[in-house]
Amino acid sequence: ADTRSYESLKNKTAEQGLTITHPKPGESLDFGSSKIEFYGPITESESDRNNGSIVMKIIYGDTSFLFTGDAEREEEQEILSAGYDLSATVLKVGHHGSKNSTTYPFLCEIMPKYAVISVGDNNYGHPTEDTLSRLRDADVKVYRTDMQGDIVATSDGKTVTVTTKKNENAQTNPTENEKSTSAQST
């Protein structure tokens, strides 16, 4: 990454005699009573920044959170092929819910209870109906920042509690039947 923010970070760390290291797939860090496992990017590419996203899981007790950045189908397939344990309580849905992320095979390995889609107004149609449909089919409770604002998932090591800043009961992933019922009542 060569954004201005990253360049500034590199300069500040160099001024302090520090270096930036990038985690590699298969590496892990103990972080207090939690653990962070890194799964991607498997293949780094300057030309494909989405698939160059860090994919990592934070494990705390019996709960875990999988963060997929903007990883798309190709990176998901490479991670699946590597054989990592991707199961997670919470999935931060990849690439704002684009049709090229959170593929069915990837989702089947994760089987999350909750999914968080970080998305705002956009011209790309994110999150796409394809991705929302896959999450519905897997019976995953969906939270969306565009509808619910800040979303906080808290773990006590046994269970995860999710709270939202607004509209906690929003229909974040309605079925076609729910959509038509809602349209008829307005």
Say what each PLM segment does.
Residues A1-T186:
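Non-globular, low-confidence helical/coil segments that flank catalytic cores
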